Amino acid sequence: LGVLAFALELTACAGSPETLPPCDPAQEEAGLAFCDLRNPEDLALLPGHAWIVVSQMARLDADANAEADPASARPGDLLAIRLADGARRRLFPPNAADPDTPWPPPPSEERWGDGACPGPPDPARFLPHGIDVGSDHRGRARLAVVNHGGREAVEIFEIGARTAPSLEWRGCVPMPEGMMMNDVAWHPAGGFVVTNFSPPLEGRGLGTLWTGFEIMTGRETGSVLRWTPDAGLVEIGNSRGSAPNGVAVAPDGSEIFVAEWGAKSIFRLRFDGDGEPLRDAVALEHSPDNLSWTRDGRLLVAGQGGGMLKVLGCNEIEEGACGIDYGVYAIDPVSLEARRLFDGKGAASVALEVDDEVLVGSFVGDRIERRTAPGRSVGSPGAQPAESAD
């Protein structure tokens, strides 16, 4: 009865929070935002740092199930934005008229990822989430994408750079049944790490409501897994947590940082020898989402305020942006000291340093905010994305 009462309360309380009006083109002209976007949930710099790649995450109706009814969700996409002038190029699903991105991809002798990958994703069902840019030991740039559409998998693309960025699908790593992944990060020693946020959230059934209860009360719902070509997917010891969300790997691979959304904390796993990693954490005032590195080797994290009920309510918003509060933090990876850089409204899910700006994306919104980095610059030249050994 207690669970049933909670389920009824959760369903009733997940109302719509404040709605921000649609992004004004004048904001884009003034260099304050990139407008006319669709849920820019995660961002990453592309090689050369002239463009960013944006994961535009589709939103499901609260009662829809994309697996059972693909038509219930409009597919998401991967978009490139040129920072200098805001020019845009859709990277995936490919444009049928674009000769640089033929689809289906031509047969290739070299496939990346798991040999059990059944083939390319269905563009009509593509639902991207967390992303990460890296390079392999041969210097080939690549993009990892968590995809929920048609299958739960990490899709792997090779990044091309002709006159503008392009993507070539190279393979995938299917995820186990009963898991809903959130974010992915390349590992410098090979493969990647990926967060298992929770069991799949489908509609407003009792399973979803129970998972929501577990997250709201800080109970464990998921963990972090590492994939390598040799060992496959393995859960990392000491990594279980409440709604593991964003993830980042230290450039030397000795530490992994995880945004524990349900616990409002960032935890660090330190690897020293063959035993379980050591774990410590720093508490935040917001529920942390995606992580990114600054040039001076600190972590940026955007987090939402208001808790799970407010976040669920964001799904009812049809235009503009969800107006829940957010905070952006810089975290020292050595001391785990967290410094709050700025606050705002707009359901922020990622903060990315670009020159003297911090770009802020949203999981329910139509814009990327362009904020001046506090103190003129968040970082100084230094850390760069790590190469991977595979």
Predicted features and spans:
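Loop/turn-rich, solvent-exposed surfaces of beta-rich toroidal or solenoidal domains
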Residues: 285-339
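Blade-level signature of beta-propeller repeat domains, shared across WD40, Kelch, NHL, RCC1
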Residues: 348-390
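A short helix->beta-strand "capping" segment at the edge of beta-propeller domains
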Residues: 16-39, 112-116, 167, 336-339
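Beta-rich, blade/repeat-based domains predominating
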Residues: 37-47, 74, 97-135, 169, ...
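Beta-propeller blade signature
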Residues: 74-84, 155-161, 215-228, 320-333
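Beta-strand-rich domains and repeat architectures in extracellular enzymes and scaffolds
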Residues: 32-76, 347-350
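Short loop/turn segments immediately following beta-strands, especially the blade-tip
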Residues: 157-165, 269-274, 372-378
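Short, conserved, GDST-rich strand-edge loop motifs in beta-rich repeat architectures
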Residues: 54-75, 145-146, 194-218, 302-323
